[in-house]
Amino acid sequence: TLFPYTTLFRSKMALQLKKATRKQVKLRLNFSAPSGAGKTYSALRMAYGIVGNWDKIAVIDTENRSASLYSHLGDFFTIDLTPPFSPERYIEAIKACEEGGIECCIIDSSSHEWNGAGGCIEINEILAQTKYKSNTWSAWNETTPKHDRFVNTVLQSPMHIITCTRSKTETIQEGGRVKKVGMKDIQREGWEYELTVSLNLDRDSHLATPSKDRTGLFEGKMPFLITEKTGEEIKAWCETGVDESAAITDAVTKLASCN
């Protein structure tokens, strides 16, 4: 009878109050723009600035091998992802990059995982028709965990990850007329908030403006062109702080020496 209380006591004792410490991180950045704004090109230039080695860069390409159009930049790797664009297939591609020693992975585009052939929207429609009597709301109970696994794979990867997301014009009805109110990512609502930085690219000028920036590198900055230097600045920010893997290795070494 005391077991539940003992377990609760132990779980409370395991919680520790400690000072916040800045740790080294891997980049999670999104480029959002309509087609033709230069998402892939910008992502490749930034990626090279981060890792400085084309052999350590890969593009998961859902855009009919469009990444190969930029092969003149350097000898980066590609994974050609074709339908179905299910979360599981994206996860498989990300894991292949990790196992291949890639340090910066570009997902171009993440939009297909949500709204492409075999993506989450289509998966949910099929589930609704076949298992939930056309009730799409109930079907999301099964579809959402699939999408969440994709998001968690991105967030937990040991690689730097840059995602490219298509955007479209968002409109509202006002006074009987259609009014443009901005651009909307073709991904699940709140996608950009999962990431460290989200940059919007202008279709005509190809200049970037931040919609979210945890780094503080772009705060108050005028629209700017993405170059390798941008990647170098981001790399410096990512590497500021404690290297957790090195700290763990050092602790294990010290522990071994005590024996």
For each feature predicted by the language model, list its residue ranges.
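Phosphate-binding/switch region of NTP-binding enzymes
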Residues: 34, 144-231
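Residue-level preference for the first positions of well-ordered beta-strands
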Residues: 28-30, 56, 104-106, 160-162
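A short beta-strand-to-loop transition that corresponds to the Sensor-1 phosphate-sensing loop
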Residues: 61-63, 108-110, 163-168
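Short, small-residue-biased leader/transition segments that mark boundaries at the very start
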Residues: 1-8
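Switch/connector loops and helix/strand junctions flanking conserved nucleotide-binding motifs
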Residues: 67-70, 113-121, 170-175, 206-210
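Conserved P-loop NTPase nucleotide-binding/switch module
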Residues: 107-142
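Interfaces that engage single-stranded nucleic acids at replication/repair/recombination sites
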Residues: 9-33, 37-39, 43, 48, ...
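Short beta-strand-centered segment that lines the nucleotide-binding/catalytic pocket of NTP-utilizing
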Residues: 55-65
